[in-house]
Amino acid sequence: MALVGRRDGRNFGYGRQLSYAGPQALRDMFGGGHYGTVKAHSDRWQAFVRWCRSDDGPGLNDARQVDRQILADYAAHLRHLVDRGDLSIATAQNRLSSVNRTMAALRGDQYVKVPSPSKALGMQRTTIRTTAPQGQDREHVMRIVETLSEQHSRAAAIAQLARATGMRLREAILADLARLKHEAEHYGKINIQDGTKGGRSGASAPRWIRVDDHIHEALRFAEQISPRGSHNLLAPNERYLDFQREIVRPARDLLHKHNIKGFHELRAAFACERYEQITQHQAPVNGGQCYAVDRRLDCEARMQISKELGHSRIDVAAAYIGGRT
């Protein structure tokens, strides 16, 4: 048993820290097995812990104080992140489900939980994009990049990388720029690996993107403003969370002023552009009718785009380019 105190003690006997207690309770619940499941729940639990400690959270460090209202507040926080474009619906629902599972492991009952994560978030998981992504106009994006460069050059590099390569925010921040530049120059394609999400194949799954002039330019700019002694956009002594707070958040506000909801929109714009390159038809969300004309080609494009975006399922492409119509 991982219990370190009385069952009715702090964090139900699993220690003084909320961040430690959750994973310990999960290990007990799964009997020391199901490593991948425990790891996934534990990672999502840490996101809940960070929110609890944040200015927006309840400021607690004891699972005994977590009640249904706190979970409802957390659901509202996640819903806000989804609305802002910072989090996918699936990720938000997974986080709520993992908090439910971890609370059950800590408490030993199902009394404190979010009854329906999808209802709590007020949205359906199977999302299909119905509005064209912002940031498809490259000239508009480059004007934003120039504006960002005046105050936050590294945020400008992130925006340019996201639009050129379809990288996620974390991937753009942690990308090994020297390696990518070498691959671009020698192979004509780059393999996005750093900062990727886990999933079934993890960060080792090949994710090659064909290089064009836009990618070459984005990599040159990012490498140029990369901090001294760093191989990515983080300074050697800089924490990722500090970078998000001090650089990304102000940059996101500027994106909003230029009618772009977030960096994720630039990723979707990349996907729509790739669909048009592959099929010679506009993306469905832009009014394209490739599916009606050539279903096989539409399917091939969706699979290719899904892989380039770092997903393993073809249906995920609909969240970026629209459904089959």
Which residues does each predicted region cover?
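N-terminal DNA-binding module of tyrosine recombinases/phage integrases
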Residues: 1-33
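N-terminal core-binding DNA-recognition domain of tyrosine recombinases/integrases
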Residues: 24-129
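Short, basic (Lys/Arg/His-rich) helix/loop patches that form interaction surfaces
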Residues: 55, 248-307, 311
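DNA breakage-rejoining catalytic core of tyrosine-based enzymes
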Residues: 124-143, 199-214, 227-231
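Basic, Lys/Arg- and aromatic-enriched nucleic-acid-binding interface segment
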Residues: 139-169, 296-299
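A short, glycine-centered helix-capping/turn motif at helix boundaries
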Residues: 152, 161-175, 273, 277-282, ...
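Conserved tyrosine-mediated DNA breakage-rejoining catalytic core shared by Y-recombinases
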Residues: 174-218
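Active-site/catalytic core of tyrosine-dependent DNA strand-transfer enzymes
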Residues: 210-279
